[in-house]
Amino acid sequence: MILRKSNDIYPLATKLVTKLPKIELLYIAGLYHDIGKGRGSDHSNLGKSIAGKFCTKHLFTDEDKKTVQWLVVNHLLMSVKSQKEDLSDPQVISDFAKTVKTKERLNYLYCLTVADVSATNPNLWNSWNASLLSELYTKTLEYLENKNSIILSPKENKAEALMLLETMQSKVVSKVKNTWKNFYSDYFENFNYRDLVLHAKYLSTLEDETLVEIIEKNSDSLSTVMIHTKDRANVFATIIGILDSENINFLDAKLFGMRNGYCLDFITISDQSGQMIKKNSSIANSLVTRLIEALDQETLLPKIVQRRQPRYLKHFNTDTIIEYKHDMTHRWTEMDIKTSDRPGLLASICKVFLDHGALIKKARIATYGERAEDKFCITSKENTPFLKKTELEKLINDMNVSLSKKK
């Protein structure tokens, strides 16, 4: 499981594991969580039954038995939620907290998730996965302790941020307030007030020009590229093309249109080993320079890098599965794409979206060994969901054809 000497790699898990009232329940859940695999049915529920029999045979209390069984059934829940859901959405946190119910279960589940991810493939445990799980844990804990703590309206988020900003010069605060007038509510819905304060450092210097900044939140998380530029066709595809050509991993994107004809995009990045790209490193400086040069052009022509698939990946054959649903609350279409990982995958996906006039509003990227599971929130050029069935079917068909090509 988790060793004390691993404090540097698993700081939160190392802290929590010492607070578990009965660590043996974590051990039993760890032993039985995958025992049902390969037996022709839902492995989690089968594992629950087998673990329950073990607990009964060894005279566990009913409460301890329920805890073990709950952990076995839900052992994938935290990993899936953190990887695939929008953790800035209060409803996501609320739903997860209602499933977990107690702080004790949350602590057990976090420790089991960390152990499971690391034991399955040590390379899957990186700064990005660690930060996602930590964020989900922290927000869920806040919800369990105070159900109103994470649900701030855009207006409340702005007010909290302004309170912190008051320590800055009044000229800076005034500039930030003026800049905020150009944002729609989605910007304030997607970030907490601490993030708004962090962004304000850069927003206070905004002019009518392209701005690219590498933001380091803290030493435990990955870097984010903040990009302010004219909002026009091909902005995101241009960014992805440059990231791909620089061999930089793209993990998450939040894209915001502004009332003044500009856009503000946030892209979470890492190097090829999954580690942070430091703000003043040579690769970061090269990235910033190339992005500014490309985005300063009046007409954007994204360069899609075509690279051969590594030989070792050709031995894995993952069928492409594309699923979608319309989200009328956010006025976009969510598209989940599961396919084989390969060089240039994101650029290929972006090209299909580009060819069909689809605008990407959000993206979440997840890679599991040779398999990629990516989520994109897209709209039509009219900023509406892709509701026309024939257009959506053509997009999906072309995406399938593109991703099925042998490289």
Language model feature labels by segment:
Residues 1-44, 49, 59:
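Acidic/His-rich, divalent-metal-binding segments that scaffold phosphate/diphosphate chemistry
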Residues 6, 55, 62-65, 80, ...:
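Conserved catalytic alpha/beta cores of large enzymes that bind or transform nucleotide phosphates
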Residues 7-19, 32, 52-53, 90-97, ...:
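Flexible, glycine/threonine-enriched loop-and-boundary segments that flank and lead into catalytic domains
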Residues 8-14, 61-70, 259-260:
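Short, glycine/acidic-rich hinge or "gate" loops at secondary-structure transitions
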Residues 29-32, 36, 48-56, 69, ...:
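Short, well-ordered alpha-helical packing segments
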Residues 42-66, 267, 376:
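Divalent-cation-assisted or electrostatically stabilized phosphate/pyrophosphate-binding catalytic cores
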Residues 56-114:
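Acidic/histidine-rich catalytic neighborhood
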Residues 91, 95-407:
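Regulatory modules associated with amino-acid/nitrogen control
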